[in-house]
Amino acid sequence: MTSERPLVYAHRGASAQFAEHTRAAYLQAIADGADGVECDVHLTRDQHVVLLHDPNLDRTSDGTGAVADRTLDELRELDFCSWKGARFPDEYGAVSQQLLTLPDLLDLLELAGREIGLAIELKHPSPYQLRLEDTVLAVLAERGWDSQSSRLGNVRVSLMSFDPEAVEYLLERVPAEHICMLVDDVQVEDVREDLALGPITGGAVANMLKAAQADAETILDAGRAGIAGPGIGYVREHPNRVRQWLDDGRRFRVWTVDAPEDVELCLSAGIQEITTNRPAEVLRQVGAAVV
């Protein structure tokens, strides 16, 4: 039992229930009472910030090819929800309304009627490189976001990436307490399988990712980023490092925590923020753990 429960962030919205990153998924997360929501962002060919995880369209839409090669209008013509198979209430919008830009998501959060967090993951490698960061910051600023407090009305904004260069770039513009350095263990076989690479290319890519992991750990060791964002597997495999970062004052946002035993691990470790595909279920579990 604990006296203060961790905050629960909805990973790509309530993405176990509805297709990730869709209007329906985020509206459901808000309705579930999530303390915050997480999103991944890419730039379109005409420089709009869209909410998608993959650099390609194939997995989560009826389109194909790179997100960066399409305009926003072209993306709006695609179906981003039917692949999931779940029907959603009419009030969550039509199929044609499910793709969201960052301004679209901000509109939904501002209407939540309560304080809510927004964790924005900037996806790299990007063909637009650090223009992605500049564009996201410009979108936020246009809405009245204050970079020092990282607040936009009722929305608490944090920015995060697995890319150490992107994180260092953000740290020059936003206080460290609002910047999350994502980190996870890199396994060569997982890289090869996920990216469908051969042994030589897969090994080379894995070595690059391992170097980035080491840089990320250095950033967190030094306290340059205020928020540590490890995967739940990393938390299990590196308890001493996790404890050291916590003791040194890093705030933790752990992903993706769906299984009850993983929630318990986070509670026992004193993790402050949990990112999950199942916000309603995790909220019930962490609520029951509060004294």
Predicted features by range, described:
Residues 180-183, 189-291:
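C-terminal active-site rim and adjoining tail of enzyme catalytic domains
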Residues 21-22, 131-133, 241:
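Residues at alpha-helix caps and immediate loop-helix transition turns in enzyme cores, especially N-
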Residues 14, 41-43, 56-57, 124, ...:
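Short, glycine/acidic-enriched loop or turn micro-motifs at the edges of active sites
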Residues 25-43, 105, 219-228:
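Catalytic domains of carbohydrate-active enzymes, especially glycoside hydrolases
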Residues 1-13, 106:
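N-terminal amphipathic alpha-helix/helix-capping segment at the start of soluble metabolic enzymes
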Residues 53-172, 177-187, 196, 200-210, ...:
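Metal-dependent phosphodiesterase/phospholipase catalytic core, i.e.
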